[in-house]
Amino acid sequence: MAHKKGTGSTRNGRDSNSKRLGVKAFGGESVTAGSILIRQRGTSVLPGVNVGKGKDDTLFALTDGFVKFESIKRGLRNRKRINITAAV
């Protein structure tokens, strides 16, 4: 019989670094061309007018202007789209 408690092992003890996803420029905000608007995984928000999409689904401004979100009906679910309206 052991007179000392055996050391157990665990499969925990690690965690991944946060990826800092989310909206970076909110509705009505002024942005410049090239500004990152949303970092996302997949296209939960679709690119609209004057908005580009990177290979990692990041949305960015193609022109200077103001951020405008809109809801669109697509299929059975509503989707969001982000546009850049021209700065006046």
Swiss-Prot record:
The UniProt record lists the keyword Ribosomal protein: yes
UniProt GO cellular component terms: cytosolic large ribosomal subunit
Ranges for region Disordered: 1-23
GO BP terms: translation
Keywords: Ribonucleoprotein, Ribosomal protein
GO molecular function, one term: structural constituent of ribosome
Transmembrane keyword on record: no
Pfam families on file: Ribosomal_L27 (PF01016)
Gene3D superfamilies per the UniProt record, alphabetical: 2.40.50.100
Protein family: Belongs to the bacterial ribosomal protein bL27 family.
Name this polypeptide is given: Large ribosomal subunit protein bL27
Name of the encoding gene: rpmA
